[in-house]
From Swiss-Prot:
Assembly description: Heterotetramer of 2 different alpha chains and 2 identical beta chains which form 2 alpha-beta heterodimers within the heterotetramer.
Name of the protein described by the UniProt record: Phycocyanin-645 alpha-1 chain
Pfam families per UniProt: Phycoerythr_ab (PF02972)
Membrane topology: Peripheral membrane protein
Miscellaneous information on this protein: The light-harvesting system in Cryptophytes contains phycobiliprotein complexes. Unusually they are composed of either phycoerythrin (CPE) or phycocyanin (CPC) but never allophycocyanin (APC), with only one type of biliprotein being present in any one species. Unlike cyanobacteria or red algae these proteins are not arranged into higher-order phycobilisome complexes, and they are found in the thylakoid lumen.
Source species: Chroomonas sp
């Protein structure tokens, strides 16, 4: 049912100062520190435990009646 739901995963690689040979990128070099950095974006199925999913569901349900950008009133109301 939900097996096809995917989310973007962003990975940032910073190899500045690393002596390993970079063979993945074959395009033109920029000649500066950007040659040693990379951003990878992929789509994958998120893996979340049932316990974490239930906590988030309860959190979302608890706030569903709150309007956007309206602060919640905390504590008890004083009676004068």
């Amino acid at each position: 049912k939900n097996g096809d739901l995917r989310a973007p995963y962003v990975e940032i690689f910073d190899a500045r100062g690393c002596d390993a040979k970079n063979s993945q990128y074959t395009g033109p070099k920029s000649g500066d520190m950007n040659d040693d950095q990379c951003v990878k974006v992929s789509m994958a199925v998120p893996k979340v435990s049932e316990a974490t999913a239930e906590k988030k569901r309860q959190e979302f349900l608890g706030f569903k009646e709150t309007a956007i950008n309206v602060p919640q009133i905390a504590g008890k109301t004083k009676k004068y």
